[in-house]
């Protein structure tokens, strides 16, 4: 508990870090539509059948664009809400975004950091990707995602950040 409190205090009282976070929250978002292009980091959480995964956030289900919007709203609440309960929900959502199976930013079924550092069994170190990565190269999936974000023209593009390419595995 002491370590967590020290880390929390360091984060809260680091002026440079707070300046960077405020800039990210002022200028950034979970996604951006610019010049007819949809930009996002990570994935659009999907099910095995290629449909958008529904995620329960505080008793309501969200998917696709609505999921991005609600997560973005809660991240901002974590920093700016005057209501302590909403700030706490926002902080919980930030943890969710970092580690959860249906997080658009994480995009994996589990986080295996501990396993990679401390265990020898390779099968335990695997972080299986969200089904999004199985479908994203299909034109019908790209069209479905673009429509979800209100982009309907043939000139629209998805610019997807952080899609690792594993050359040694033949990608």
Predicted features and spans:
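Feature recognizes metal-dependent phosphohydrolase scaffolds
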Residues: 1-171
